[in-house]
Amino acid sequence: MKKIQISPSILSADFSQLGNEIKRLEEGGADMIHVDVMDGHFVPNLTIGPPVIKALKKHCSIKFDVHLMIAPVHKYIEAYSDAGADIITIHPEATDDLENSILKIKSFNKKVGVSLNPESKIDLIKDYLEKIDLVLIMSVNPGFGGQKFMPEVLNKVKQLKEIQSRDNMNFDIEIDGGINFDNYQSAIEAGANILVSGLSLIHIS
């Protein structure tokens, strides 16, 4: 069984204190930091860009798990790679050529993640599972923090776990959205090994 990892999201953090927030999370035992990048187009919210990630990366050693909710995503991959992303996760709906975008991320020696929204089917990515490092299952509709967990997505997590076991694959299964002490165990039991949440969950791993 894979080690359970916690990737705290900075989406709800005090953006004027991001450096201190990340340092606090790192010292608290986080395995990585989840950075949500939104463009106001692919999702209805705006967050941070490459210069902020680059500045933050200078002051910490923890891995940055960067979730790109931007379209078209392909042309921004290099900028986020250069900024210091360790994992770059993209949505299949945000690129005209998912395989080419996966290869581009790999060309910068970054780990590749592909994200599925609550309504997105596994069929969208099943042909690429051998080529990626991580599948991110959204358990809320992307765009804003603080939404309620959608338990129906756990069926998708279970399906991915079955594919992983059947075909002897090694990708991580990450879940993001409304994860808390009431539901994290069900996410783990379904097959998730990376939980995106706040500081409160750090010590469960």
Range-by-range predicted roles:
Residues 141, 148-189:
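Active-site/ligand-binding-proximal alpha/beta "capping" segment
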Residues 202-205:
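Conserved small/polar residues in nucleotide/adenosyl-binding loops
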Residues 192-197:
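Acidic, Mg2+-coordinating phosphoryl-transfer loop and its flanking beta/alpha structural elements
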Residues 37, 177-179, 200:
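Active-site metal-binding loops of divalent metal-dependent hydrolases
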Residues 108:
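Residue microenvironments linked to proteolytic maturation
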Residues 1-89, 93-97, 104, 112, ...:
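Conserved N-terminal beta1-alpha1 strand-loop-helix module at the mouth
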Residues 115-119:
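Short gly/ser/thr-rich secondary-structure transition/capping motifs
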